[in-house]
């Protein structure tokens, strides 16, 4: 994928408006009483500062941004504060809504929002977190349904038309068709792209499917990566691990060095055991790494193991093992929900459908005085979007590392 400022467009029909927007009203019908009521009385559920369902959350510069159709913001360093409305896109939204968010070069504070029926718009917070002018439209994106960030200066867009193509965000111009129809972009990074149909790799601005090893069985539901070139692909029944090989321009099963022990059979995929899985995230707490998989009731967790061999690009090979798969979190002290917090998790978000999982890396400086050790600072902030018809639970939740509890945001 080129590092030039660009926007790639991947086709999708109007009936498929985003995985995070998935309706979850039919996912859970369980009735819990007794012990759950007692636990909730010990940890009162907060009144949410963002009402309703959540369709996206990203970090851009020093701020977190979330959308429930409108835009909300929160300073990363100011823990315990409520979210506030951000009006930067209001002049464009009108009677429409934001469907998704992406951070274009996230550390620089550039935010991209997809506004249904209007297109994708970019806005920068500018110096000292001040507004840097009005939002600017990205050329040729009027039919965009959602936007997916890459962590660089490029974003992918899903469109209502029947073409796959690209257009530059810094230049005006048309679209060049270059791929299949009826695809939906799920996740992307520097040099790779995951759609509902396949995994693609490329650095020329037009990634193509070129894969070795075990192939994920479509439809692909979601994907994430660990920042070291490993991509984790979620399907109805399994999770697959693939390695981006930039030098050869392909996606492959993680190879072992000649000196390493042979990899276990089936190390590149594993059954995840999560019912109605539809979201996935990578979570690292110190040296412990996990995949988090949102589903019908709460989210599951898979602990990752890295082999001793190098994959040739500086990162150890990742193994997926059945004994490390859990259909619920709360089983491991270094997990996303520590073992001691499992009961409180089960009485709250563990009862309901999790439609989105957002892991936000922390900085060890600036506004982290509450954290007593550098080890604590290694634990990222964890947010989940609960989607259900029960207003007590629907919306954004966060795990409070200090209180060791889940609660509303």
Curated annotation (Swiss-Prot):
The lineage of its organism: Bacteria, Pseudomonadati, Spirochaetota, Spirochaetia, Spirochaetales. It is found in: Cell membrane. This is Uncharacterized lipoprotein TP_0133. Its main location: membrane. GO terms for cellular component: plasma membrane. It is a lipid-anchor. It comes from the Bacteria. Keywords: Cell membrane, Lipoprotein, Membrane, Palmitate, Signal. Belongs to the TP013X lipoprotein family. Residues 1-29 form the signal peptide. A lipid is attached at residue 30 (N-palmitoyl cysteine). A lipid is attached at residue 30 (S-diacylglycerol cysteine). It comes from Treponema pallidum (strain Nichols).
């Amino acid at each position: 994928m080129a590092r030039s400022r660009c926007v790639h467009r991947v086709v999708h029909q109007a009936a498929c408006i985003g995985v995070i927007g998935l309706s979850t009203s039919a996912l859970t019908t369980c009735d819990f009483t007794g012990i759950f009521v007692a636990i909730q009385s010990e940890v009162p559920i907060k009144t949410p500062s963002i009402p309703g369902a959540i369709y996206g959350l990203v970090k851009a510069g020093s701020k977190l941004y979330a959308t429930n159709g409108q835009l909300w913001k929160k300073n990363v360093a100011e823990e315990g504060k409520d979210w506030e409305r951000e009006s930067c896109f209001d002049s464009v939204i009108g009677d429409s809504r934001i469907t998704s968010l992406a951070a274009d070069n996230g550390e620089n504070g550039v935010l991209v929002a997809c506004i249904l029926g209007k297109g994708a718009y970019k806005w920068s917070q500018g110096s000292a977190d001040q507004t840097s002018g009005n939002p600017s439209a990205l050329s040729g994106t009027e039919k965009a349904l959602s936007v997916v960030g890459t962590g660089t200066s490029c974003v992918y867009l899903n469109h209502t038309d029947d073409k796959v193509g690209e257009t530059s965000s810094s230049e005006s111009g048309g679209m060049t068709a270059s791929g299949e129809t009826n695809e939906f972009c799920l996740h992307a990074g520097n040099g790779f792209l995951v759609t509902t149909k396949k995994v693609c790799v490329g650095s020329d601005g037009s990634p193509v499917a070129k894969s070795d090893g075990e192939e994920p069985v479509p439809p692909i539901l979601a994907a994430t990566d660990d920042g070291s070139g490993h991509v984790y692909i979620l399907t109805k029944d399994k999770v697959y691990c693939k390695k981006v090989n930039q030098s050869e321009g392909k996606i492959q099963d993680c190879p072992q060095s000649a000196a390493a022990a042979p990899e276990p059979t089936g190390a590149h995929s594993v059954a995840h055991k999560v019912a109605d899985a539809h979201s996935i995230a990578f979570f690292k707490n110190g040296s412990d790494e996990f995949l988090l998989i949102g589903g019908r009731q709460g989210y599951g967790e898979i602990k990752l193991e890295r082999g001793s061999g190098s994959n040739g690009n500086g990162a150890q090979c990742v193994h997926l093992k059945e004994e490390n798969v859990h259909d619920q979190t709360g089983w491991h002290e270094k997990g996303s929900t520590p073992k001691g917090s499992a009961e409180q998790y089960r009485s709250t978000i563990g009862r309901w459908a999790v439609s989105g999982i957002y892991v936000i890396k922390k900085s060890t400086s600036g506004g982290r005085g509450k954290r007593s050790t550098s080890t604590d600072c290694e634990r990222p902030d964890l947010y989940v979007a609960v989607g259900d018809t029960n207003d007590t639970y629907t919306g954004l939740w966060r795990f409070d590392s200090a209180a060791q509890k889940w609660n509303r945001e």
